[in-house]
A protein has these predicted regions:
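C-terminal segments that line or cap access tunnels to active or ligand-binding sites in enzymes
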Residues: 205-221, 283-285, 290-520, 526-540
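Rossmann-like flavin
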Residues: 100-207, 219-220
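Helical element adjacent to the flavin cofactor pocket in flavoenzyme catalytic cores
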Residues: 203-285, 289-291, 303-304, 309-311, ...
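Conserved FAD-binding subdomain of flavin-dependent enzymes
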Residues: 72-113
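Glycine-rich Rossmann-fold phosphate-binding loop(s) that bind the pyrophosphate
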Residues: 29-35
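Glycine-rich FAD pyrophosphate-binding loop
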Residues: 42-69
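A short, Lys/Arg-enriched amphipathic alpha-helix followed by its capping loop at the start of a domain
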Residues: 37-50, 236, 240
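Extreme N-terminal leader/targeting segments of oxidoreductases
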Residues: 1-25, 43-51, 555-563, 567-597
Length: 597
C-alpha cells in the first residue's frame, strides 16, 4: 500500500489483484469503516460479492451513522456529520455509489450539486441572553501568547505530544478566546483532550481556518447520515451480492503468531444466544472494527431520562472484543483499549432531538438564525452555541436542511441539541442534563432561544416531542494517547487481518470524521489485497505556504503584520525580513495573503 496525490492515480482503475478469486472476507461491524472495506473489496479488490460477509450485532447497518424514527417515541439522531471538500477517500468511494434518489448519478454528484446550489454558512454562530446574537463576528480574538502557543503546537512533533492534554500545551488565556469557543463546540474537544489530536486537526484543516467562524468550510448531506450515506452504500453492496448477517455478536478473533507471522484462524461469535465459530485459512480476510464511540448509548424520551445504571468504565461489547484481541499480543501491537474506555466521565456527552411544528417556536428560531427551516435549505448552517451556558450544560443546537427524514411530516422541524457537560445544572433547568427527561431538556433549549419563562414548561410539554441519548464513550478517541495505543490498520506481520475505524492508527488524519473511517477501510483492503493503486494521501495544506500564510492572516483577525502587537525587537526583525523578501515571490505571497500591505 502506498499513498498518492493527483488525478493520475485518482482516475486510474487498478488491475485485478493476484489471487482475488481465492479470497473470502469477513467484516466485523457495519459502520462506515466496515462498509467502506466491503466497497473497496468489490470495486478495487475485485472480490466476488458472494464471498464478502458483513457481521453485524444489531438489526440495522450503519454503526454510529444512524438516524431513525421510533413510532412510539419519535425521531432519534445521536449525532451529525460535517464534511470537507478534501475528504479524499470519501469522495473516491461515493463517486461510484449510485444515488437512490436521482437515477444515473452518484452520491457524490448529488451531494456536490446540493452544496453548490445551497452553500453552507451560519448567520449566528453563538447566542447569549436568551436568544440574542453573541456577536462573535467571525473573530478569533487570540492574544499573543495563545497565537504563539498554537503555532508551536502546529510544529511540535507528534512524539513529543504523546499522553499530553491540550491544557498542558496552551496558556490559560486561550480558554477565553473565540477560537476555543468555535473549536471546542465544533469538534467536541475538551481541555483534557489529546494535544496530539489537536495538532492533527490544526494541520489537517489549516486551509479552512477562514471558514471556522461561520461554518462556510462545511458541507452537509440532504437528509440524515443514514439515509444519505449508509443506505445507498448498503444497496450498492447488496447489488453486488455482498451479504449482511445481522444478529452476529462477535466476541473474539483468534490470532496465531508464529515467529512474527500473524494469522487470524477463527472468529468466535454468538447468534440468537448460541455460541459459534468460523474457522479461517490465510485466504480468508478479517476486518475488525475495534472500539465504538457510541457503545452502550442510553436513550431517553419525552417522559423518561436515559437509564445510566448499567454504565461502567471499560464496559461495552466493542471494548470487550478489542480487549480479547489485545490480550493475544506479544508486544502490545493490537493496541490498548483501556486508554480510551476507562473514564466515561471524561468521554461522555449527550444529545437530544426536538420535534416541533409550532409556529411561535419556529419564529423564535427564525429570529436567531435569520432563515425559515421549512424552506428546505440551510437553516442554522451549523451549531448555534449558547455562550452563557459554558459553565452549565454548555449547550449548542442546529437545524440541518429539512426534512431530515423522508418520513418526516410536512412543516415539522427537527432540532438537534447537544451538551458537552452533562453533570452540571442548566441555566433554567436546575438538574444535570443526564438526569433529565426529553421534556426537561427541551425546557432548557426553549429558555435559551428566548421563550418567555412563564410559557416554557407548557410549550416543552405540549408543543414539542424530545428524545435524548447519553453516550458515555462519544469522546473516547480524544483521550490523550501514544501512537501505540491504537493498532496499525494492518499490524506488522499480519497476513489476513486488519483493524478498522476510529481506533485504528493511520498517519496524519483526524478522528471523529467520516473520512477517517473510510480511509482505514481503503488502506486495509489495499494492503491485504495488494491493490496496485495509490491511496489518496491526507490533503497536504500544512505543506502549502500559501495556505499557511492565509491561515496566519485569518488567525490574527485579518490584520497585516505591521499592525500586530510586536515588541521593539520584533519590529526591527520584521523590518529586516520585509526588506529581505522585497522583489521576490515571497513578497507576492505575503501580499496575496493579506499579511503584507
Amino acid at each position: 500500500m502506498y499513498y498518492s496525490a493527483g488525478t493520475y492515480e485518482a482516475f486510474a482503475r487498478p488491475e485485478k489483484p493476484e489471487g482475488a478469486d481465492r479470497k473470502s472476507a469477513y467484516i466485523v461491524g457495519t459502520g462506515l469503516a466496515g462498509l467502506a472495506a466491503a466497497f473497496y473489496l468489490v470495486r478495487d479488490g475485485q472480490v466476488k460479492g458472494e464471498r464478502i460477509h458483513l457481521l453485524e450485532k444489531l438489526d440495522l447497518a450503519g454503526g454510529s451513522c444512524d438516524g431513525r424514527k421510533d413510532v412510539r417515541k419519535g425521531f432519534y439522531m445521536r449525532g451529525g456529520r460535517e464534511m470537507d471538500n478534501h475528504f479524499e477517500c470519501m469522495w473516491d468511494m461515493f463517486r461510484d455509489v449510485p444515488s437512490i434518489e436521482t437515477p444515473g448519478v452518484s452520491v457524490l454528484d448529488e451531494y456536490y450539486w446540493l452544496n453548490k446550489h445551497d452553500p453552507n454558512y451560519s448567520l449566528c454562530r453563538a447566542s447569549e441572553k436568551c436568544g440574542q446574537d453573541a456577536h462573535t463576528d467571525k473573530k478569533f480574538t487570540l492574544d499573543k501568547d495563545s497565537a504563539l502557543a498554537l503555532s508551536k503546537l502546529f510544529m511540535t512533533p507528534e512524539k513529543d505530544l504523546e499522553d499530553k492534554k491540550i491544557s498542558e500545551v496552551l496558556p490559560d488565556s486561550f480558554w477565553d478566546t473565540n477560537f476555543w469557543l468555535y473549536w471546542q463546540t465544533m469538534f467536541a474537544f475538551q481541555r483534557w483532550s489529546s494535544a496530539l489530536e489537536m495538532k492533527r486537526y490544526l494541520c489537517r484543516y489549516c486551509h479552512h481556518i477562514d471558514g471556522l467562524p461561520d461554518f462556510s468550510a462545511l458541507r452537509f448531506t440532504k437528509y440524515n447520515q443514514y439515509e444519505s450515506m449508509i443506505l445507498p452504500l448498503v444497496k450498492y453492496l447488496e447489488s453486488h451480492g455482498v451479504s449482511v448477517e445481522y444478529g452476529m455478536d462477535v466476541k473474539n478473533v483468534v490470532i496465531k503468531d508464529e515467529n512474527g507471522k500473524k494469522t487470524a484462524t477463527q472468529i468466535v461469535y454468538e447468534k440468537d444466544g448460541k455460541p459459534g465459530t468460523i474457522d479461517l485459512i490465510e485466504d480468508d480476510l478479517v476486518f475488525i472494527t475495534n472500539g465504538c464511540c457510541t457503545d452502550t448509548s442510553c436513550y431517553g424520551d419525552q417522559n423518561t431520562a436515559p437509564d445510566l445504571s448499567q454504565i461502567k468504565n471499560g464496559a461495552g461489547e466493542s471494548w470487550d472484543l478489542w480487549k480479547n484481541i489485545a490480550a493475544q499480543a506479544k508486544n502490545g501491537e493490537y493496541g490498548n483499549p483501556d486508554k480510551f474506555c476507562d473514564d466515561f466521565e471524561a468521554t461522555n456527552w449527550m444529545s437530544a432531538t426536538v420535534e416541533t411544528s409550532d409556529e411561535e417556536i419556529i419564529q423564535k428560531i427564525i429570529s436567531i438564525c435569520k432563515r425559515d427551516p421549512r424552506e428546505g435549505k440551510v437553516t442554522t448552517g451549523g451549531i448555534v452555541t449558547v455562550k452563557d451556558s459554558t459553565d452549565n450544560w454548555y449547550l449548542s443546537w442546529t437545524i440541518n436542511r429539512q426534512p431530515q427524514f423522508k418520513a418526516q411530516d410536512k412543516n415539522t422541524v427537527l432540532i438537534w441539541v447537544y451538551a458537552l457537560t452533562t453533570n452540571k445544572e442548566g441555566n433554567y433547568v436546575k438538574k444535570a442534563m443526564r438526569d433529565c427527561t426529553g421534556e426537561e431538556v427541551c425546557r432548557e433549549w426553549l429558555y435559551h432561544i428566548g421563550v418567555p419563562t412563564d410559557q416554557i414548561d407548557d410549550w416543552a410539554k405540549n408543543r414539542c416531542n424530545t428524545t435524548t441519548c447519553f453516550m458515555p464513550y462519544i469522546n473516547a478517541f480524544f483521550q490523550p494517547r501514544k501512537e501505540s495505543d491504537r493498532p496499525l490498520v494492518v499490524p506488522e506481520g499480519a497476513v489476513n487481518f486488519a483493524f478498522l475505524g476510529q481506533f485504528a492508527e493511520t498517519p496524519r488524519d483526524t478522528i471523529f470524521t467520516t473520512e477517517y473511517s473510510i480511509r482505514t477501510g481503503m488502506e486495509a483492503v489495499y494492503t491485504l489485497m495488494n491493490v496496485d493503486r495509490g491511496v489518496p494521501e491526507v490533503w497536504g495544506s500544512k505543506y502549502d505556504v500559501r495556505e499557511l500564510l492565509r491561515a496566519a492572516y485569518y488567525a490574527v483577525d485579518k490584520k497585516p503584520i505591521d499592525e500586530l502587537p510586536l515588541s521593539l525587537k520584533e519590529k526591527i526583525v520584521l523590518k529586516q525580513v520585509i526588506k529581505a523578501v522585497e522583489g521576490t515571490d515571497l513578497e507576492i505571497l505575503l501580499k496575496e495573503s493579506g499579511l503584507l500591505r
